[in-house]
Amino acid sequence: MTRLERRLLIWRENFSGSFSAKVRWRMKHDRNPLLVTVQDKYLVRQWAHARGVETVPLLQMAEDADAFPIETLPPDCFVKASHGCGWNLLRREGVFYEFGNGTAFVDDHGLPQPAAALAARRVDDAACRALWRKWLGQKYLAAEWAYQLMTPRLLAEPVMAQRGNGPQRLYRLFTMQGVVQAIAVGGPVFVRTESDYLVFDRNWTRIRMPGEHPPVDEAVLGERPQTLPDMLEIARRLGSELDFVRIDLFDTPQGAILNEMTVYPSGGQPGRPFVSATHNRWLGRLWKLPGRTRR
């Protein structure tokens, strides 16, 4: 996309009230302090627990990289920053790796890659601490207001298993005032195979879009989760106090578990979250911004 094409797309989205235009409006204008709480990967835990929602367990937390004890971490876990996006490491069999978006860690069917295939992403303990110091000394993108008010922290979390031991999926619930309007199923295998989200309504009816490229294993990856009623209830509890929030859940053997909440999906980039501009406008028009009736 050229710079001119991008500017034209943003203009069209702003004019039509498309979803990304609403995200950009929130980034610029909305200073609701609750946005900070739910976006913070540490604070959102106690906020969710107070509403009866289980989260990914917290193994360790520290505000100082040198106070984060590697020797007490389990051999398999994630270490991430609470105040940013994409700042994460995977520890597997006692070895740290740069995780990124996870695509290097799965094959084209979403199954784990052997350790030999990950050698280029390996990070030793000293490099880990250097990364952690870097993260703790940074603020995430200035345009995303909520991040600027967060206390930098390091978190350790267990690796969550997918119910049924299939490829791990993340269920992104686009929630308006507690009502789920769309569910986008994704995960590392989608990015690896350059596939689009599988999108469903709250009843798990597939929302097909022109130009979409679903994954080859669509039948498996798009299987209706047994915990769908629980997911919708979680979204009601966590989303009812906000005009919009994306609630990201895992479907685990222990049930539906909150991974995180997102108030600025894709950072307001144009042409998101779906491949179809028509559906992006549809989703945007369902989002009623505070003090506004249409846009």
Give the role of each language-model region:
Residues 62-67, 159-163, 250:
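Short, solvent-exposed loop/turn elements at beta->coil junctions and helix N-caps
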Residues 83, 87-95, 164-207, 231-246, ...:
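Phosphate-binding core of ATP-grasp and ATP-grasp-like enzymes
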Residues 106-213:
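Phosphate-binding site of ATP-dependent enzymes
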